[in-house]
Curated annotation (Swiss-Prot):
Entry's Gene Ontology BP terms: protein insertion into membrane; protein transport
Membrane topology, record value: Multi-pass membrane protein
Organism of this sequence: Shewanella baltica (strain OS195)
Protein name: Membrane protein insertase YidC
Highest taxon in the source lineage: Bacteria
Length: 541
């Protein structure tokens, strides 16, 4: 009876978890979409000197202003010489779709959608501002390619102002990496001092996340400061209030499932993390750096980094000790982090993510085996106590206080913990939820094949075979536990439908998660047989 109730408890906890996370996603108001409110918000922006970006294709990109193309082993990038903005970025080593050769496009600027990385110099003598417009850079070539044996590729852009000051903007690309160094070199050949300030921002058309109850994903902003290690800043947050936080270091990013773009200014600089929403419906998040005073005849260098790529925790940690937090495991991150590490460890040996999931399932079940054994032992003792519990109910009738006291004395005498059957279930749920987030957030599982018909563990089984097998395994587990005569008829009906309900839920779950649950059930059935054989020798049934 207790086992049946425990399975029911798992179902209720699991459904409650899904409903809770869907409520979390839906409870906040949607982004303000009216033109008047967006204009008002833009007018109140703390980043008023930062230039706006037009929606659609920039008018400046004409036959006389050709985009600069940069190709490396990881990135295919296009830079607009007007301002030096990155207006296109494709990830060469990541496909848009598994069965096609088209690379995944993260940044782009089309008629209907804008997602670009903008940077420039603002301030009193800045060459990029709302009032002055953008600088028109010149470059020696319009196509750059990282050659074989070449570790870095520099793309220099030059602008000479009316006062004779030379501004050089250099993009530095690295082999095997998704981060780009953006360096300014200002040679003040004028007779007057200059004052400039670097900024970097990411601009994106407000677009809803492609999220569902079983596959919740986030699309929006995020930032980090010296006081706030990591915080999401949703599009509706930007529409309601402009972010304006002073910090040492920090970073600002746009997130989506598996991928991130981020500006990371120097960790020792005084920066301001800001956000805004422009009148055209573009959400902006970025940083404004320190103000530099450049004396006549002096040269000043100002640098920052831009990352555009997958949520690779190792690569992100190498750039900033908090940037890896964009891989958000939720409130059980402390449990998910070691699970992810163990998953990576197993995969490095077996070379297959599906086998790694099976190994981590065996590990989890092995660690929980002592608790599982204690659970079934407690349940067996409870079953043996049923005749005595029935006698207590008949003896005390409706006197619940005396009956409860007598039951506790009986449990103490027989050394039975009535909650012993629930504890392993309660401990397994956080592990399951943590693994759920690991499989959902880990970009390594994107397009990762297992075997046979499972070509991508990050999406649902295309033929629903794993969910059906999982349902069968639950049915077998259920049949191995006899239904006690004292069990409530309503609970019996709910228990009979639980394998069906779980099967329906798991139809749309990532195949990797269903694989974990299926293997876990098979292991549980095996453990159950072993434990029951041992209990039978002790006279417990």
């Amino acid at each position: 009876m207790e086992s049946q109730r425990n399975i029911l408890l798992i179902g209720l906890l699991f459904v409650s978890f899904l409903l809770w996370q869907q409520w979390q996603a839906d409870k906040a108001p949607k982004p303000v979409a009216t033109e008047s409110s967006l204009v008002a918000n833009a007018a109140n922006s703390h980043s008023a000197d930062v230039p706006e970006a037009d929606t659609g294709v920039p008018a400046a990109v004409t036959a006389t202003s050709k985009l600069i193309t940069v190709k490396t082993d990881q990135l295919d990038v296009q830079i607009n010489p007007i301002g030096g903005d990155i207006v296109f970025a494709a990830l060469v080593s990541h496909k848009m779709e598994q069965d096609k050769d088209q690379p995944f496009v993260l940044l782009e600027q089309t008629k209907d959608f804008t997602y670009i990385a903008q940077s420039g110099l603002i301030g009193r003598d800045g060459i990029d501002s709302s009032a002055k417009g953008r600088a028109a850079f010149s470059t020696a070539a319009t196509e750059y390619t990282l050659a074989e044996g070449q570790d870095t590729l520099e793309v220099p852009l030059t602008y000479v102002a009316d006062n004779g000051v030379t501004y050089t903007k250099v993009f530095v690309f690295h082999r095997g990496k998704f981060n780009v160094d953006v360096d300014y070199k200002i040679n003040n050949t004028s007779a007057a001092p200059l004052q400039v300030q670097m900024y970097g921002q990411i601009k994106q058309t407000i677009k809803p996340s492609e999220s569902s109850m079983v596959m919740p994903t986030y699309r929006g902003g995020a930032f980090s400061t010296q006081d706030v290690r990591y915080e999401k800043y949703k599009f509706d947050d930007m529409a309601k209030s402009n972010l304006n936080q002073a910090t040492l270091g920090g970073w600002a990013a746009m997130l989506q499932h598996y991928f991130v773009s981020a500006w990371i200014p120097p960790a020792t600089d005084s920066n301001t993390i800001f956000s805004s929403v422009s009148a055209g419906g573009l959400a902006n998040i970025g940083f404004r750096g320190a103000v530099y005073d450049i004396a006549p005849g002096a040269t000043q260098e100002i640098s920052s980094q831009f990352y555009v790529g997958p949520k690779d925790q190792k690569a992100l940690s190498a750039i900033s000790d908090t940037l890896n937090l964009v891989v958000d495991y939720g409130f059980l991150w402390w449990l998910a982090v070691p699970i992810h590490w163990l998953l990576m460890f197993y995969q490095s040996f077996v070379g297959n993510w599906g086998l790694a999931i099976i190994l981590i399932t065996l590990t989890v079940r092995g660690l929980l085996f002592p608790l599982t054994k204690a659970q079934y032992t407690s349940m067996a003792k409870m079953r043996n106590l049923q005749p005595k519990l029935t006698d207590l109910k008949e003896r005390f009738g409706d006197d619940r206080q005396k009956m409860g006291q007598a039951m506790m004395e009986l449990y103490k005498k027989e050394k039975v913990n009535p909650m012993g059957g629930c504890l392993p279930i309660i401990l397994q749920m956080p592990i399951f939820i943590a693994l759920y987030w690991v499989l959902l957030e880990s970009f390594e599982l994107r397009h990762a094949p297992f075997m046979l018909w499972i070509h991508d563990l990050s999406v649902q089984d295309p033929y629903y075979i794993l969910p059906l097998l999982m349902g069968v395994s639950m049915f077998v587990m259920q049949k191995m536990q006899p239904i006690a005569p004292t069990m409530d008829p309503m609970q019996v009906k709910m228990m009979q439908w639980m394998p069906v309900i779980f099967t329906v839920f798991f139809l749309w779950f990532p195949a990797g998660l269903v694989l974990y649950w299926l293997v876990g059930n098979i292991v549980a059935i095996t453990q159950q047989k072993i434990i029951y054989a041992g209990l039978a020798k002790k006279g417990l049934k």
